[in-house]
Amino acid sequence: MNLREKYNIPSSSVITIAGTVGVGKSTMTKALAEALNFRTSYEKVDTNPYLDKFYDDFEKWSFHLQIYFLAERFKEQKRIFEYGGGFIQDRSIYEDTGIFARMHYEKGTMNPTDYETYTNLFNAMVMTPYFPHPDLLIYLEGPVEDVIGRIQERGREMEQQTPHDYWYEMHGRYEDWINNFNSCPVLRIGINDYDLLKNPEQVELIVERIAQMLEQSSLKEKIEGLNYFYRDREKYSELSNEIARVIRPEPAATF
């Protein structure tokens, strides 16, 4: 019996991993996918036609870059749900608008017109009842000093050249974003609570927490559905009584 069956996690579940650079999103994605026998969905940056241009000129290409990311993530989300779920997703569609596009706008590297166009498009595409939101978002978090230490340890050249002030700002923006996020259930996991590279068996502890969150979310949906049903039934009863009074008016009093 695998962990998905042991903890009764639906095979159609879609779980997305979020968090700033260096918190271990890819490691978590891989570990959970193997534990649950799910597929993975990773961010594709090699085929992005705007990335190099963007780094040369933020102001000119920030809007194009964000539109490209939105389109690609939307298509990927659609593909995942058309496949029937069963995916662990590295990075969510929500982070681009909630963090990166907003940062460019606030810093002046995306003009107000482009930012408004982008956010309107995002809201029309994603923030609707028709968009297939994930069943759970796992947010990886930890002290900014530990995050910077991880970034330095893995030694990627572009990241090594990035000033520490940027990582501090990004850490703060992520915290502000997740504290106001409500598009799907959230499970917050501290990066110092587990070490999946040294202790891969710890993934079961995370799977157990995922199962609890999914069960709570399912129960909440059922309760909300019942509340809606009873509210709807009361409205229906009131409407029926009103119609009955119109169709069968009370007889006039006789003297």
Each language-model region and where it sits:
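Conserved substrate/cofactor phosphate-moiety recognition/catalytic segment
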Residues: 34-73, 99
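P-loop (Walker A) phosphate-binding loop of NTP-binding proteins
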Residues: 20
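NTP-dependent small-molecule kinase module
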Residues: 148-255
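A glycine- and Lys/Arg-enriched "phosphate-lid" helix/loop adjacent to the NTP-binding pocket
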Residues: 99-172
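Extreme N-terminal, non-catalytic leader segments
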Residues: 1-13
